[in-house]
């Protein structure tokens, strides 16, 4: 029988291969343990998030107004107050005054946007009335344009009529109305309620931004509103 004798070199190669196999096995075990640890971590995290979500939903439910009656036992009934409280919280989250205190440019843009929105609202209302009466609106536009210019609003002049560059809807109303409409859509089906919520949004926005006008040359939104109303009344009173 032939006896096979391994040379020292072959023995070293086999030993190295065995060592490599053991190292690979150890690496695989370590990797498996790491994957398991990560998996357990995500399971634990998901569980905690679920608990927080359930807790939040319970808190939200407890804050909802309930009406109990024979036809709707235990059914939550939304009220205007619930929607308005949500809109107020949304406005607080936007934090207009906080952002303005940190950024002078933001504060200036906010003041201009608010006064431009006041200008646009009054212009549209009065122009629609004057046009319906067949009255030329050019003199009215010239006068309120001059008032807007005197208020410090930037803009352009065309055909002797100054128009604020930021003329348009109040930019803060849309986020409030949109978020409330998304959360409570059935409360916005009625047009009367839509108008009511818009008026409320304008009111709380004006209250929020009022302090931004305390230390500037611009009139407050209320003062600018009065200036434009006086101009409009002069033309409206002359309508037949």
Curated annotation (Swiss-Prot):
BP term (GO), one: actin cytoskeleton organization
Sequence segments annotated as region (GEF catalytic domain): 78-240
Induction: Transcriptionally activated by InvF in association with SicA.
Major place of residence: secreted
Site (Helps stabilization of SopE-CDC42): 103, 109, 124, 131, 174, 194, 198
Region (Catalytic loop involved in contact with CDC42): 165-172
Residue numbers spanned by region Interaction with InvB: 15-78
Annotated Pfam families: SecIII_SopE_N, SopE_GEF
Any one cellular-component term (Gene Ontology): extracellular region
Compartments, record wording: Secreted
Family named by the database record: Belongs to the GEF (guanine exchange factor) SopE family.
Further details from the record: Encoded within a prophage region, which is only present in very few Salmonella isolates. SopE-expressing S.typhimurium strains are associated with severe epidemics.
Protein name: Guanine nucleotide exchange factor SopE
Organism: Salmonella typhimurium
Lineage: Bacteria, Pseudomonadati, Pseudomonadota, Gammaproteobacteria, Enterobacterales
Gene: sopE
């Amino acid at each position: 029988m032939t006896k096979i004798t391994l040379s020292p070199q072959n023995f070293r190669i086999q030993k190295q291969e065995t060592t490599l196999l053991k190292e690979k096995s150890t690496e695989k075990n370590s990797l498996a343990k790491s994957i398991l640890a990560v998996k357990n971590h995500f399971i634990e995290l998901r569980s905690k998030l679920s608990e927080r979500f359930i807790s939040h939903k319970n808190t939200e439910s407890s804050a909802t107004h309930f009406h109990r009656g024979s036809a709707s036992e235990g059914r939550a009934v939304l009220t205007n107050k619930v929607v308005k409280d949500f809109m107020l919280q949304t406005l607080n989250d936007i934090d207009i005054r906080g952002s303005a205190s940190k950024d002078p440019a933001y504060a200036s843009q906010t003041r201009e946007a608010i006064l431009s929105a006041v200008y646009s609202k009054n212009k549209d209302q009065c122009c629609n009335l004057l046009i319906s009466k067949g009255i030329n609106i050019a003199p009215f536009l010239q006068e309120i344009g001059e008032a807007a210019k005197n208020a410090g609003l930037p803009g352009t002049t065309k055909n002797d009529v100054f128009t604020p560059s930021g003329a348009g809807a109040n930019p803060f109303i849309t986020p409030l109305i949109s978020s409330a409409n998304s959360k409570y859509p059935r409360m916005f089906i009625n047009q009367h309620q839509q108008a009511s919520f818009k008026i409320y949004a304008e009111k709380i926005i004006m209250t929020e931004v009022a302090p931004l006008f305390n230390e500037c040359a611009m009139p407050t939104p209320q003062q600018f509103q009065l200036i434009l109303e006086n101009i409009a009344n002069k033309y409206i009173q002359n309508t037949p």
